């Protein structure tokens, strides 16, 4: 029996796939538990519509990420920190502090986990911080740390 998978089933198929499975398995397990639907014209057209909607949403998400990238690359986040001799900071500037400053000053909310900073910023001056906005879009945010 041909079925359209509505959910991922380990070892059998992923959501949206059309596969041929045993009749008993399809009727008694997959369809009964809502993991799959019989592959008739209605189910296939519904699947096609769902794929188009997902593609449209993905394109909109990508465009939104591109626009945010353009905006972020023009900004500079200004932070103040206490420092000692030679421009070394007491402690470091973390991604949380950068995200909070970006939210407070520019009104742009970005999750701190999207920023890639290995050890934090430990010196005064400008630092470029990569921000992963989408799996295809990465922006570079300028962070300027000045002495308090």
From Swiss-Prot:
Keyword Ribonucleoprotein: yes
Entry keyword set: Ribonucleoprotein, Ribosomal protein, RNA-binding, rRNA-binding
One of the GO BP terms on file: translation
Pfam families xrefs: Ribosomal_L9_C, Ribosomal_L9_N
Any one of the GO CC terms: ribonucleoprotein complex
Gene3D superfamilies for this protein: Ribosomal protein L9, C-terminal domain, Ribosomal protein L9, N-terminal domain
One MF annotation (Gene Ontology) recorded for this entry: structural constituent of ribosome
UniProt keyword annotation of rRNA-binding present: yes
PANTHER family: 50S RIBOSOMAL PROTEIN L9
Function: Binds to the 23S rRNA.
Similarity annotation: Belongs to the bacterial ribosomal protein bL9 family.
Protein name: Large ribosomal subunit protein bL9
Originating organism: Lysinibacillus sphaericus (strain C3-41)
